[in-house]
């Protein structure tokens, strides 16, 4: 039996890019949520948490409409000469960012909220500029939150199925990630190949969560 590594590499590529994009996007959102008292805060919290409770097919359906040739993002992509978004890796990436957004925002929100305001005020009295305070004081204090956000968003992307199937379909080398490849093997009654993929994903998920809890436990004891 020859093992097809293409879905593995594609999944790792998708998860890595999703994680990086989410850290960039979720950081300002989480910081604003942790400090703002604006009336729209509850609305933003609801929207960023919504993917947690929505069935993946519902989210995938509306993303498919948005990314389709007649949707706003799909039309914009075509006008910019970037090509279609549905059934492409770019579409998968956008869908993964939406789907895994809560797994980045929530840990960062909790980490930012736990920072003692007196430490930030102390940095202000030393005439540190806002960006200097953020990078030299806030980010180091929120490091466990950043680690949790990175690990959870990466691991969640690895296990995606419904959203990626609806947006990307099942194109080998382009959109066929691990979960889709495993589904293919099960449909073809190729249980040995499906077992290798499922077992690998199980070991990966357990290892990631164990390492995360171990790190967070050590951090809280310090």
Feature-to-residue mapping (PLM):
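Non-cytoplasmic
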Residues: 69, 146-184
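Cytoplasmic-entry segments and transmembrane alpha-helices of multi-pass inner-membrane transporters
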Residues: 32-63, 120
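C-terminal transmembrane helix and the adjacent membrane-cytosol boundary/short C-terminal tail
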Residues: 40, 102, 109-120, 124-128, ...
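Interhelical loop and adjacent transmembrane-helix boundary motif
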Residues: 1-6, 167-206, 210
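Membrane-interfacial helix termini and adjacent extracytoplasmic/periplasmic loops
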Residues: 60-97, 167-171
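Membrane-helix interface segments
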Residues: 36-44, 72, 88, 118, ...
């Amino acid at each position: 039996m020859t093992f097809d590594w293409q879905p593995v590499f594609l999944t790792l590529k998708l998860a890595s890019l999703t994680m990086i994009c989410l850290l960039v996007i979720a950081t300002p959102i989480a910081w604003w949520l942790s400090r703002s008292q604006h009336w729209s805060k509850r609305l933003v919290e609801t929207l960023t948490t919504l993917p947690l409770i929505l069935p993946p097919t519902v989210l995938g359906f509306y993303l498919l409409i948005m990314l389709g040739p007649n949707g706003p993002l799909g039309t914009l992509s075509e006008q910019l000469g970037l090509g279609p978004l549905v059934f492409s890796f770019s579409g998968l990436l956008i869908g993964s960012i939406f789907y895994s957004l809560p797994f980045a925002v929530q840990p960062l929100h909790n980490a930012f909220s736990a920072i003692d305001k007196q430490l930030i005020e102390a940095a202000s009295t030393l005439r540190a500029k806002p960006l200097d305070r953020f990078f030299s004081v806030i980010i180091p204090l929120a490091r466990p939150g950043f680690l949790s956000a990175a690990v959870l968003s990466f691991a969640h992307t690895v296990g995606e199925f419904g959203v990626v199937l609806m947006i990307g379909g099942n194109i080998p080398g382009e959109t066929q990630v691990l979960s889709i490849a495993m589904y293919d093997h099960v449909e073809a009654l190729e249980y040995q190949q499906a077992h290798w993929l499922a077992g690998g994903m199980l070991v990966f998920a357990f290892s990631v969560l164990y390492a995360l809890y171990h790190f967070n436990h050590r951090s809280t004891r310090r």
